[in-house]
Amino acid sequence: DGGNRQFILVTNNENNICEEVTYPRIKKVIEGYNDKKGIPANVKYFKTDYVPYVITDNDKRTLVSKSTELLCISENTFEVIKQNIKKMDFAIFKNAKQYTAIIYDEDSIENCCDELIKINPKHKVVIYVFSYDHSYDELDFETLNFKFDVKPIPEAILNVYRKISKLKRK
């Protein structure tokens, strides 16, 4: 396979096996040891958390902010280009072949587009937009002069949580 490998390791972290053993070992292999050179790779570590039942628009916004990592996993874009944790207006991530923009607030579409124009991506761009009613329009992105796809959020994520909630209530 030419050494091009990807994997996702999932554990309940019993006895802190992931935090104290597995993750540090993988990280050391990547970074290298005193007598051994590292390898060109990366590792990401995520913890899951319970997200309460989604009812209000504010709950939806919280869910979207907690789903950022899921969208990055989905698009395989982990390198942070722009992210304002406090403001939560938009974030931009990339890998060698693609950019992912996540817009948490429709009022930030223009600012995100301005930032993307500054970056001037040479690769595919996927833009996720949080919208209560899908009221954004392709025209909102008319200033972009590169290839991009716009996808709504959190509807797909909310649908998963709706299914889970139905199962829990049965």
Predicted regions and their residues:
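Accessory, often C-terminal, charged low-complexity segments
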Residues: 2-170
